[in-house]
């Protein structure tokens, strides 16, 4: 059987079933997802060559994955800087932000220009929007999406390249073109349109019964790895 690519409804259903049927908590899955993202980044963009990472976080769970990834990347020898234009006023996200602050991870208030990003960073982690995204991009995020579209820096996108349709992929030719896509739990249909160099699967937490129910046919994670190349 081939690896299954999920449509938007299937992605939402799988997520909800992890919470309701399998009793995972949001922070539990977010920690595992963000950690797997950090490991995928480290495999593709070693800290020796790409130490400075701009981590762009959105308002939902995708942004939470980015905050977790930033914390772990800081422990792996990277220097992450967080751009979080619309922080989520929920204890989970406030705690994740606080953890980053306590680990001396800096943040920026304004979205860097293309030129500033080119001089100050080596890589951008795109953790803006996940599989629940529906266009258009809200005003708070227009500047950072334009940065992602225009930058020459390599981009690592968490689950969905920001601005893409979860099923159809790019909506315009100028949409984000990440070098690394980290699909979480299972790849979404838009990943079929990914043309970048690196595609990894992260989120090593899917119960076998859930895999069978949805026919996910996920690849085997090698050894003790937290992500697997697709």
UniProtKB/Swiss-Prot annotation:
It is an enzyme of class 5 (isomerase). Its EC number is 5.1.99.6. Coiled coil: none annotated. Gene3D superfamilies: YjeF N-terminal domain. Disulfide bonds: none annotated. (6S)-NADPHX binds at residues 61-65, 130-136, 159. The keyword Metal-binding applies. NCBIfam families: yjeF_nterm. This is NAD(P)H-hydrate epimerase. It comes from Drosophila yakuba.
